[in-house]
Amino acid sequence: MRKNSVKNTRINGEVLKELSNIIRSEIKDPRINPMTSVVAVEVAPDLKTCKAYISVLGDEKSQKDTITGLKSAEGYIRRQLARTVNLRNTPEIRFILDQSIEYGINMSKLIDEVTEHDNKMHVEVEDETE
């Protein structure tokens, strides 16, 4: 199976949906932040490994604790995934912290600051010319 085949894309979507459901409703580890979401999943073409990109809303300590909690629950998550997703091999899951949402929020704030500064400068120039 090729990496970007229709079958692989469908498997990625199914694993993403089930992984999100397992993390949200079945894991009771207090280290895992309730504001945790699965952003993307990449299942290898041989179905042996899976990269799960996780986004955590919170500070850096909360993010590290969540990843640690998910790694400790990896065996349980894999068993639950095997029960819900019908695959020949249940992939070994690697959790990767995805900070793209935080990066986007930070960039948006910077753009807003520059726009606000530009507007202030524009108003000051207009006041001086009058």
Swiss-Prot record:
The keyword Coiled coil does not apply. One of several proteins that assist in the late maturation steps of the functional core of the 30S ribosomal subunit. Associates with free 30S ribosomal subunits (but not with 30S subunits that are part of 70S ribosomes or polysomes). Required for efficient processing of 16S rRNA. May interact with the 5'-terminal helix region of 16S rRNA. HAMAP family: RbfA. It comes from the Bacteria. The keyword Ribonucleoprotein does not apply. The lineage of its organism: Bacteria, Bacillati, Bacillota, Clostridia, Lachnospirales. One of its GO terms (cellular component) is cytosol. It is found in: Cytoplasm. PROSITE patterns: RBFA. PANTHER family: RIBOSOME-BINDING FACTOR A, CHLOROPLASTIC-RELATED (PTHR33515:SF1). Keywords: Cytoplasm, Ribosome biogenesis. Monomer. Binds 30S ribosomal subunits, but not 50S ribosomal subunits or 70S ribosomes. Belongs to the RbfA family. It comes from Lachnospira eligens (strain ATCC 27750 / DSM 3376 / VPI C15-48 / C15-B4). The gene is rbfA. Its main location: cytoplasm. GO terms for molecular function: ribosomal small subunit binding. SUPFAM superfamilies: Ribosome-binding factor A, RbfA. This is Ribosome-binding factor A. One of its GO terms (biological process) is maturation of SSU-rRNA. InterPro entries: KH_dom-like_a/b, RbfA, RbfA_dom_sf, Ribosome-bd_factorA_CS.
